[in-house]
Structure formats: C-alpha cells, structure tokens
Amino acid sequence: MRKYWKNIMADFTFAHREEGFDEHIEFSIRGYRNLLDDIVNYSRYFVEDNTNVIDIGCSTGKVTLKMLDSNKDHCKDARYVGVEIAEGFFDDLDKRQKEIKKQFPWANIEFIKDDICNYKFENCSLVTSVFTLQFMPKRHREKVIQNIYDGLVTGGAFIFAEKTIAQNSLIQDMITFNYYDYKRQNFECKDIMDKEKTLRHMMKPNTWKEIQSMIYDA
C-alpha cells in the first residue's frame, strides 16, 4: 500500500488532491473511473447554454472539470458550480480553478463552500452527486432531492450515485465481504477497518426502495 494512503484512510474526507485522494477513491470503489466517465458522457444529453450545472460534493473538482471539457463545443455558455462542504479540499479547488482558467479562459466555473441543505438550486439543466447524499443526515435527504427537482429546467436531470444497503441480511453480508476482499488488493486490513470505524457516524446509506421513494415523491 502506498505510504500516503495511510493518512487518507485515516482522514479521507479532508484529503488533498496532492496526497492522492482521487487515486485513492479509484482503488477503493470498483468501477469508479467508469462511473465518472458515464456521468460525463450522460451530461452531454442535458447540459444547455445559459443554465447551471451543479456538482454536489465536488471534492477535488474532477467531475466538474470533465463535464466542462466534454460540453465546451456545444454549450460554451453553461455555468458550472462545484459545491463542497469539506474545508480541506479548498486549497486544491483554488488551484484547480486557476488551472481551468488557464486552459479555458472563457469558462464560467466556480467552486463554493456550502451545505447543500441550504443551497438554492435554480435554472439547472444538470445536477450531479457522486456518493454525497449518504453522508447527509437522513432527515434532510428528501428535502434536498425535492429542492433539486424544483430547480431543474424542463428536460433537466439529476444524476447521482449512492451506496445502498440490501434489505436481505445474507445478501448484504455477501456484498460487504466481497467488497473487503476487493479492497485488500490495495489496502491493509487494519487500514480498511479503521476507515470503516471512522465512517460509522458519517455514512448512513439507504436501501434502494428508500431512494426510489424519495425520487418518486419529489
């Protein structure tokens, strides 16, 4: 295991890009890179000029930048906003924004520190969220999804990915231990368990039925 990942495993929420956060997540979540690629590809169907594209929990701004790059030829006047609440990412995000301005001087993009429970969604052609809602208090999730839905333009979309828990305990055990086997390819057992302990009070996944219910009610 790479040495700098030990610190990230201990406090991954506040890890910096220079310390390998993006790479760490790719090695932690099977298919993560493909997931991001799919989201970026799907964005081409929804991003429109003179609308907002919001990336919730943008961390290092990777997806925000990829969507900007992917849509630059046909939607140059879209506005991109990366919303992040973790203070530890903002040194990286400041650097990311400067890099973007050099590469795309015309780009309308910003990264802001905000709690999405309080964020006002409006005129959005696309809102994305990658493993973010699961870290929010459950009592706020339905309201946030409703706010997102209310802020979409006609034909707009909310694309999100979430960790879920199975309703069947045997299936949940199968998924969990298979996931541990996968993570042991890149991380030490103690580091995996330490991270799991850290996440206990932070991450509260829903079942798929609960997520469906929140979506249908919005």
Model-derived regions: residue spans:
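A conserved beta-strand element that flanks and buttresses the S-adenosyl-L-methionine
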Residues: 128
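A short glycine-rich, Lys/Arg-flanked "PGG" loop and its adjoining helix->strand segment in the class I
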Residues: 142-154
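C-terminal alpha-helical "lid/dimerization" subdomain adjacent to the S-adenosyl-L-methionine
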Residues: 164-216
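Class I SAM-dependent methyltransferase SAM/SAH-binding core
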Residues: 54, 59-117
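Class I SAM-dependent methyltransferase Rossmann-like catalytic core
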Residues: 7-11, 15-35
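Short conserved loop adjoining the S-adenosyl-L-methionine
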Residues: 118-122
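Conserved alpha-helix/loop element of class I SAM-dependent methyltransferases that forms part
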Residues: 31-49
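Conserved beta-strand signature within the Rossmann-like core of class I S-adenosyl-L-methionine
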Residues: 155-163
